[in-house]
From Swiss-Prot:
Induction: Accumulates upon nitrogen deprivation. Triggered by NAC072/RD26 during senescence. It is found in: Plastid, Chloroplast, Plastoglobule. This is Phytyl ester synthase 1, chloroplastic. The lineage of its organism: Eukaryota, Viridiplantae, Streptophyta, Embryophyta, Tracheophyta. Belongs to the diacylglycerol acyltransferase family. It comes from Arabidopsis thaliana (Mouse-ear cress). The gene is PES1. Keywords: Acyltransferase, Chloroplast, Plastid, Stress response, Transferase, Transit peptide. Mostly expressed in flowers (e.g. sepals, petals and stamen). Acyltransferase involved in fatty acid phytyl ester synthesis in chloroplasts, a process required for the maintenance of the photosynthetic membrane integrity during abiotic stress and senescence. Exhibits phytyl ester synthesis and diacylglycerol acyltransferase activities with broad substrate specificities, and can employ acyl-CoAs, acyl carrier proteins, and galactolipids as acyl donors. It catalyses: a 1,2-diacyl-3-O-(beta-D-galactosyl)-sn-glycerol + a 1,2-diacylglycerol = an acyl-3-O-(beta-D-galactosyl)-sn-glycerol + a triacylglycerol; a 1,2-diacylglycerol + a fatty acyl-CoA = a triacylglycerol + CoA; a fatty acyl-[ACP] + a 1,2-diacylglycerol = a triacylglycerol + holo-[ACP]; phytol + a fatty acyl-CoA = a fatty acid phytyl ester + CoA. PANTHER family: MONOACYLGLYCEROL_DIACYLGLYCEROL O-ACYLTRANSFERASE, TRANSMEMBRANE PROTEIN 68.
């Protein structure tokens, strides 16, 4: 028995004689009362592998039949808000330790293992199969094991150093597992994460198994190997003598990955700059560089030559059948990949594949999964790829954001805005008293938060942070369907993806129905994109539909409506070019017209009357100001429970609608007046306060 640093438990029973069958078992041990054992072992004399899984579940499996006949389990009932996803706790050092450990008993055919770090997934979790790159160890997901293990049954393919199974044989290894998984969990997707060479393997498998529900995640796929910058150097590698081979993997390591990015993984961004630099220096000199010299043991000379041959055959095989791929595909491409032209390949695959999305990481190298970036699970969530049946359900399949995701979003996504606007929150109690904080907002759902959409939706980030930190509530906000469009073959993982990580959903009546039915806190802006992209002179003006759109649905579920107002957009920027101004510029006119025409396919507000029906999408011209402050006021909650007349009587519902609208307008007027009394409205005053009050956790504001 050998236990490695990545908590992999290996139970080998290897007979290395060529005329005897080889057996190999790997077990994932899970703490807690309910344990699962996954046995993956060869069953054919030719060394191919099939999967046999036995799962003990005290509640019983509640498989979804794809037609909605059974009540689906809700992921957020099993995973708490701000859970620990473990990303950053393991680094490339752990990868090398795990790789060395698994190579100690490295005989036999290709096999599968389930890392113990993955733990116990949520109920009805789909399967994720990791197909490794050139190293073949299967340890390329080490930094992601804990996070992925919450959402998937994870199995990783290990190809022993001395194994010489051809590409077609590896296809059979994967297909045997797919067939067994399809028989065990017939109504669930199967995820194939293919790293580099594994990307060729995943595409080839998908082309040969078009009837299966597969989701491919291709990380710098080696389908572009024939166009690699290294092609002129490959003949030289074959002539390097054995005694000098140790230099080859060492040199390749600097081409395949970014050592600085690898060393940065796991260093806390909250640390002072000097401390971070010192930690990075120590990791580079004491950990990274010594570890790179060990690559020769992972990829010996004969193995390297075999892997290059395997890469050529895999690249040719996958490209010859790429037209047959029907699977859902997500390509992750690094901008600094020195081994493959990954960004160019991502564009090519986006054009060839029928259902392909792309996310580019411009600062990463070839070994993206081992470098400092974003958790793979975060990328899957942000691109809307996580589902547990044949289609995504925004309620039951939603994975709450983790502690690490919140920290990254606050520091790297909101960043300057969050610190500059110094947001202040007020709410109204049932007796009408206005208090600081969010105490007046009900804790139990369903709750419908209805308010004013500030310029470009700048109020969303600080508001989401306040609800999470003060009330431990994640509200679900609506997003324009254009954010779910993946037509850009060079798209980065950006703000639009992050709002999906934090619960945004496409704006449809059906989705609002589902969320209220699940007793969620739901954020609604009746003014939509038209209000967020308003013209000059329209700040703080409600551009709402003439007739109510939400009161009757709220009443159907007995939801509490909380109207709110926000102010502060005019304190951070001056709107100088609005839609009317931009349409007078010929080049911009053509661009905005084309974008607006493309968005009409979403058919938003087709039946609405008035100005709100006009929702052109554009970027307004802004001149920044010395930042002021954002203010939020949540009005007195309006109960709809026990008022069945609101469901049946449109006039009664419209009266409540007008009441909500008036309350939002009153909140805005109140904040505009009271902010004049705030001695710390300017960022300069708040900065001075923070410097003179080092123990203060929050800069004060006006008294309500």
């Amino acid at each position: 028995m050998a236990t490695c640093s990545s908590s992999l438990l290996v139970l080998p029973n290897l007979r290395l004689s060529s005329n005897q069958r080889r057996n190999f078992k790997v077990r994932a041990q899970i703490s807690g009362e309910n344990k699962k054992a996954t046995s993956l072992e060869p069953v054919n004399n030719n060394g191919s592998v099939s999967l046999s899984t036995t799962v003990q579940n005290q509640k019983g499996a509640n498989e979804v039949n794809g037609k909605g006949k059974s009540k689906r389990k809700i992921v957020s009932d099993e995973i708490e808000l701000l859970w620990d996803d473990g990303y950053g706790s393991k680094s490339v050092k752990d990868y090398f330790a795990a790789a060395k450990e698994i190579l100690k008993a490295d005989g036999g055919p290709p096999r599968w293992f389930s890392p113990v770090d993955c733990g116990r997934p949520v109920e009805d979790a789909p399967t994720l199969l990791f197909l490794p790159g050139m190293d073949g160890t299967g340890m390329g997901l080490v930094p992601h094991h804990k996070a992925l293990g919450k959402a998937f049954h994870v199995s990783c393919l290990h190809i022993p150093v001395l194994d010489r199974t051809p590409f077609e044989g590896l296809l059979k290894v994967v297909e045997d597992v797919l067939r067994q998984e399809q028989a065990t969990r017939p109504n669930k997707p199967i995820y194939l994460v293919g790293d580099s060479f594994g990307g060729c393997l995943a595409l080839a498998v998908a082309a040969r198994n078009r009837s299966l529900d597969l989701v491919l995640i291709l990380v710098n796929p080696a389908t572009s190997f024939d166009r690699s910058p290294l092609q002129p150097l490959l003949p030289i590698l074959e002539m390097v003598p054995e005694e000098l081979h140790f230099t080859v993997p060492y040199a390749l390591s600097f081409i395949m990955g970014d050592p600085i990015k690898m060393a940065t993984l796991g260093i806390d961004n909250q640390l002072p700059t000097g401390v971070k630099i010192e930690k990075l220096r120590q990791r580079l000199t004491k950990t990274m560089l010594p570890l790179l010299s060990e690559l020769g043991g992972i990829i010996p000379r004969e193995t390297l030559l075999w892997k290059l041959k395997l890469l050529r055959s895999g690249c040719a095989y996958a490209n010859s059948r790429i037209h047959a791929v029907q699977a859902e595909v997500l390509v992750l491409a690094s901008g600094k990949d020195m081994m493959l032209p990954s960004q160019e390949e991502a564009k090519r695959l986006h054009g060839l594949l029928k259902n392909c999305s792309v996310r580019c990481f411009k600062d990463n190298g070839h070994t993206l999964l081992l470098e400092d970036s974003i958790s793979l699970l975060t990328v899957i969530k942000g691109t809307g790829k996580y589902r547990r049946s044949w289609r995504y359900d925004l309620v039951s399949d939603f994975l709450p954001p983790s502690k690490g995701e919140l920290a990254y979003a606050l520091d790297e996504v909101l960043g300057f805005l969050r610190n500059a606007v110094g947001s202040v929150f007020f709410s109204t109690m049932e007796d009408g008293k206005i208090v600081k904080g969010l105490a007046g907002v009900p804790d139990k759902g369903p709750v419908l938060l209805v308010g004013y959409h500030m310029l470009m939706g700048l109020e969303l980030g600080p508001m989401s942070e306040a609800f999470i930190k003060e009330k431990n509530i994640l509200f679900r906000g609506m997003a324009h369907p254009v954010l779910y469009s993946d037509n850009d073959p060079a798209k980065a993982f950006d703000y639009g993806d992050w709002i999906k990580v934090f619960g945004a959903y496409p704006v449809t009546a059906t989705n609002l129905f589902k969320l209220l039915d699940s007793k969620s806190h739901v954020l609604l802006f009746p003014g939509g994109a038209r209000e967020a992209l308003h013209n000059r002179g329209e700040q703080y003006k409600l551009i709402w539909p003439e007739q109510q759109e939400f009161v009757r649905m709220a009443a159907r579920f007995g939801a509490t409506i909380v109207p709110f107002g926000t102010v502060g957009e005019d304190d951070i920027a001056e709107l100088v070019l609005d839609y009317n101004d931009l349409m007078k510029i010929p080049i911009l006119n053509d661009y905005i017209t084309e974008v607006t025409r493309d968005t009409k396919q979403f058919k938003l507000r087709e039946e609405s009357e008035g100005e709100v029906a006009n929702q052109p999408l554009y970027l307004p011209g802004l001149i920044p100001k010395v930042p002021g402050r954002f203010y939020y006021l949540f009005g007195k909650p309006i109960e709809t429970k026990g008022r069945p007349e609101l469901v049946k009587d449109k006039e009664e519902a419209n009266q409540v609608y007008l009441e909500v609208k008036a309350e939002v307008e009153n909140s805005i007027a109140y904040l505009l007046k009271k902010r004049e009394e705030d001695p710390y409205r300017s960022v300069l005053d708040r900065l001075n306060y923070s410097l003179t009050h080092t123990t203060a956790t929050h800069v004060p504001s006006f008294e309500p």
